[in-house]
Amino acid sequence: MAFTDKAEFNVPRHIVQKGGVNPETITVNKTLTYKDSQYQLLRNNTGSLDCILPAYKDGASFWIKNRASSTHNIVVKDVDANTIATLAAGEGVLCVSNVSAWWDVIKG
């Protein structure tokens, strides 16, 4: 897709995403849907768990952070069980999708 320089979309106010943040403690794998918050702040207090992204969708994105204070990882996977990122305690990732894949854009 190509963009043009015509008619930029301007937002003259700050953006508020009501319900867009989900701080949650997980004890089992978490499967996301497009009804879930875009920002997932997950605390994993058990062994390594998976956070499974929804089906591929052009332009979709999720921010996922491992809020654990222990050594328990969260493995972010796509719907086909491919690993996108492994998050140690305190790490987060921005995942973006097109119609055929998820990618990790920023991780740290």
Where are the model-predicted features located?
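Exposed extracellular interaction/assembly regions and N-terminal maturation sites
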Residues: 2-76, 98-108
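Tight coil/turn sites that cap or link beta-strands
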Residues: 37, 88-92
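Generic beta-strand structural signal
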Residues: 88, 97-98
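Short edge-strand/loop segments of extracellular domains
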Residues: 78-84
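Short, surface-exposed secondary-structure edge patches
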Residues: 53-54, 84-86
